[in-house]
């Protein structure tokens, strides 16, 4: 049993293969407290860790210091306005304009299943191995039920958390904050790790000490964003990739979020994660229910690397639903950086004809095929084919591509509307806008109000018609701007604070319909590159475009930060042109291919115009993809070295689950003069197996796994920046 309640000790034990998460009930089963989370411990009395036997004591023993108790008690879900001055997990506004709320324990349930979250992405359990603890809590004054959900995925060392809130009073109440998880523990010299960025440099790792007060990252942009990521970890300062204790939370959501650590006056840490409370409110009428999105929580006693592999396995096994989850994805070529808006059927077929000869398996037609769109100023929302560009329409183009033995895919941006469009002329009220205020344009477009079912239905029918008109097997779903001017003509004044969350729910509903109606469709999400690369999107699409920056060297740090928590199979990665269109850098074609191999792998350039020697490498690269993709897609990822840290080289590897095969990628970013070969210690191998290095220059390139991990392998020192090397080891 993963979950056990000890009636005598009032302790809930949530156990995974390597961890224990202990919850305690205090003061005659009134308060739900956090006792312990970390390495798995034997079943014993841990109640002393709640410190209820020392001042200020529990309220039943010392009512005069109830406030002090609230302000120090390690709560599993903190109330608001009654004495705990740390960050609250929930806040309300009543009809009387008051804000106090304090859920206390009522009862519990343990169930052998993983409940779904209505309208939200969430982890699933197809093998029926997970268990769920539901702690029923209530604020008796407000008649507000607050149910805390904990699902234990034992083999993944993962716990998911979410909250169900139900209003049983006769009056409506407004939620002004509803976090998904709260975790209190003593500080132990922890540092905080988050991911920051911008367009073209997403998910850069940032590790820093935790000072007193609140340290947070978040987004109020209507999506998870380029700038911050809905993830945080905290660890001892001595923790590395291979050693040390690491705690991590990841939000399975695609909208506004906050991830925060707070160090208190007594050196305790409070970690919270959930929907960002800025501009948020949700009206709960009598007997209505609100579900918070889910948080994935893990602990590793073996450094960041084990944390990474916990997330990778968990998302592959329990979050990605697509039929492509365990399948090799087709090698695609996207025409965006090849042509931008300047294309027609002839140009696309020229690219496809050559691509088909080189082993590329799908042509993806990007932005510019619809309405009268020849630049970014027009036609979003007008989802009909521009037959001036594509004479004969999609049917002719797709048929011709299929005749070449290739699949066909298409780009769409369903959430957006151009002021210069037929749709906007017909329905200007469909854009998110504040009445009387001039809308804020971004990329010459507004955002459609996806909180409205009539808007979603109209757009969905347009998408469905396009996808049904030809043999389209892939969709790139883009979102090229963030939300501003938050206002909906369909929501009353006291529900305007619901817009951002309802918008995200609308996107989820659209993608749920799409994947249901077109179950064989390969969906790739995108948002101006990687602005909506989050677990919520991963639930609907098995891969997400990692960044619009396709430069191989820039991609090293982008893909490092992404692979910290996401499986390599989820990262959209392409070989692109040089000089690179974002940074102007020239890198070897070989390096571009080998860096893109640590992702979905594809091409984004006009292969009819590149040098002959580069064209000749494409069949080698497509063969490389087919040879190694099963290993890359399913194996365990190990970060060996980071160019971000050493400013010299980058190295990572993937090891098969049975440890009989490994692929090492090494990139020399900056060559150095007068150096010996570099010794690199590998990870994750079986120390008792011998490994043959495929393609080794010596006759007998066989090394023990223990030797490769402890003594290391040698990488030659050669002239030239941006050189890459692949080393394939197979158990002998």
Where are these regions (language model features)?
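C-terminal beta-sandwich/jelly-roll accessory domains of carbohydrate-active enzymes
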Residues: 670-732
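Short Pro-Gly-centered flexible turn/kink motifs
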Residues: 100-105, 282-301, 722-729
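Aromatic-lined carbohydrate-binding/catalytic grooves of carbohydrate-active enzymes
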Residues: 324-461, 474
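Conserved, mostly hydrophobic/aromatic
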Residues: 18, 163, 287, 333, ...
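Carbohydrate-binding surface patches
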Residues: 232, 241, 644-686
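Active-site neighborhood of glycoside hydrolase catalytic domains
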Residues: 391-393, 425-427, 431-590, 600, ...
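Polysaccharide-binding surfaces and accessory modules of carbohydrate-active proteins
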Residues: 5, 10-13, 21, 31-262, ...
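Glycine-rich, aromatic-flanked loop segments that form ligand/cofactor-binding clefts
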Residues: 71-74, 79-109, 114-116, 243-256, ...
């Amino acid at each position: 049993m993963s979950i056990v309640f000890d009636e005598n000790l009032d302790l809930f034990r949530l156990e995974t293969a390597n961890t224990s998460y202990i919850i305690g009930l205090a003061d005659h089963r009134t308060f739900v407290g956090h006792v312990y989370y970390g390495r798995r411990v034997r079943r014993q009395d841990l109640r002393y860790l709640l410190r209820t036997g020392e001042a200020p004591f529990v309220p039943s023993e010392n009512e005069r210091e109830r406030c002090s108790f609230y302000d120090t008690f390690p709560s599993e879900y903190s109330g608001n306005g009654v004495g705990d001055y740390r960050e609250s997990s929930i806040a309300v506004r009543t009809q009387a304009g008051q804000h106090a709320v304090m859920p206390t324990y009522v009862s519990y349930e343990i169930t052998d299943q993983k409940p779904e979250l209505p309208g939200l992405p969430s982890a699933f359990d197809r093998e029926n191995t997970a268990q769920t603890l539901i702690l029923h809590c209530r604020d008796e004054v407000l008649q507000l039920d607050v149910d805390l959900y904990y699902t234990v995925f034992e083999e993944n060392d993962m716990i998911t958390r979410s909250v169900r809130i139900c209003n049983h009073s006769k009056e409506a109440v407004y939620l002004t904050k509803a976090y998904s998880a709260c975790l209190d523990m003593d500080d132990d010299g922890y540092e905080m790790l988050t991911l920051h960025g911008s367009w073209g440099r997403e998910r850069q790792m940032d590790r820093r000490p935790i000072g007193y007060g609140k340290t947070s990252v978040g987004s109020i942009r209507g999506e998870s964003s380029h700038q911050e990521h809905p993830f945080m970890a905290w660890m001892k300062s001595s923790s590395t990739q291979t050693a040390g204790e690491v705690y991590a939370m990841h939000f399975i959501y695609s909208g506004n979020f906050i991830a925060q650590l707070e160090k208190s006056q007594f050196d305790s840490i409070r970690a919270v994660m959930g929907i960002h409370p800025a501009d948020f409110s949700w009206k709960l009428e009598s007997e209505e229910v609100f579900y918070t999105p889910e948080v994935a929580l893990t602990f590793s006693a073996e450094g960041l690397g084990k944390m990474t592999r916990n997330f990778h396995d968990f998302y592959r096994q329990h979050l990605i639903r697509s039929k492509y989850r365990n399948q090799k994805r087709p090698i695609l070529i996207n025409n965006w950086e090849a042509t931008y808006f300047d294309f027609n059927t002839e140009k696309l077929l020229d690219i496809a004809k050559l691509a088909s000869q080189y082993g590329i398996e799908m042509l993806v037609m990007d932005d510019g095929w619809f309405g009268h769109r020849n630049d970014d100023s027009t036609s979003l929302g007008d989802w009909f084919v521009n037959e001036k560009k594509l004479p004969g329409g999609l049917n002719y183009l797709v048929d011709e591509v299929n005749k070449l033995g290739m699949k066909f895919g298409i780009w769409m941006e369903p959430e957006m509307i151009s002021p210069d469009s037929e749709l906007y002329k017909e329905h200007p009220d469909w854009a998110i806008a504040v009445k009387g205020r001039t809308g804020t344009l971004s990329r010459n477009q507004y955002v459609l109000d996806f909180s409205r079912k009539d808007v979603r239905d109209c757009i969905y029918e347009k998408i469905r018609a396009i996808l049904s008109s030809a043999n389209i097997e892939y969709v790139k779903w883009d979102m090229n701007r963030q939300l501003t001017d938050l206002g909906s003509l369909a929501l009353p004044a006291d529900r305007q604070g619901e817009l951002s969350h309802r918008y995200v729910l609308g996107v989820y509903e659209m993608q749920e319909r799409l994947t249901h109606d077109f179950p064989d469709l390969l969906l790739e999400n995108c948002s101006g590159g990687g602005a909506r690369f989050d677990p919520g999107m991963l639930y609907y699409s098995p891969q997400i475009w990692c960044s619009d920056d396709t430069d191989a060297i820039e991609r090293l740090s982008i893909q490092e930060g992404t692979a910290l928590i996401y499986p390599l199979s989820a990262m959209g990665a392409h070989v692109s042109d040089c000089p690179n269109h974002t940074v102007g850098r020239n890198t070897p074609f070989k390096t571009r291919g080998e860096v893109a191999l640590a992702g979905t792998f594809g091409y984004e350039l006009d292969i009819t115009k590149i040098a002959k020697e580069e064209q000749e490498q494409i069949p080698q690269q497509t063969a490389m993809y087919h040879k190694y993709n099963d290993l890359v897609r399913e194996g365990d990822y190990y970060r060996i070295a980071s160019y971000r840290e050493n400013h010299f080289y980058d190295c990572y590897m993937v090891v098969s689950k049975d440890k009989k095969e490994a692929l090492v990628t090494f990139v020399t970013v900056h060559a150095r003069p007068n150096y010996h070969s570099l010794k690199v210690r590998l990870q994750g191998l079986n120390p008792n197996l011998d490994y043959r290095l495929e393609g080794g220059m010596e006759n007998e390139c066989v090394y023990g796994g223990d030797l490769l991990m402890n003594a290391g392998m040698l990488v030659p020192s050669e002239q030239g920046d941006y050189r890459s090397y692949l080393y394939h080891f197979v158990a002998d």
